[in-house]
Amino acid sequence: MHSFDEVHPLQMPTALETGTLNVHGLAGLCAGVRWLLEQGVESLAARENALARLFYEQVRTAPGVTVYGDMTMQPRAPIVALNIGQEDSARVADILWEDYGICVRAGAHCAPLMHKALGTAEQGVVRFSFSHFNTEQEVQQAAQAVCALARELLCE
């Protein structure tokens, strides 16, 4: 061992490695990939997109709610982006978390040119992302929260 040498080793793979290898991280990555392969990527995607469609169908006609994106496009990510009236997306996200315990992402999502194209550069959007681990009940609760919040905010 040459732990205290002032020159980094030149031989491979040591030249590319510093410190102790992240063995726990590698084991977790291996287990995660194994689980994905066992479940089937297509099966997981179908479930996630079904949850996103369920949410979309429940919020798309709610007064004051604007949903962005085409849910018929395939393949697509299980994401629904929306706004409530002219409310700032960060305010909507804060209320969803504080009052309903629903975690979403608000803002420009590192896509400023898309927001310019959508006309949401100032407001941003509220992004709901669904995963295999969400339940239909959670999706319905999120949709009910959006509808209730829209009624509340539009009456202010």
List each model region and its residues.
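Pyridoxal 5′-phosphate
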Residues: 1-156
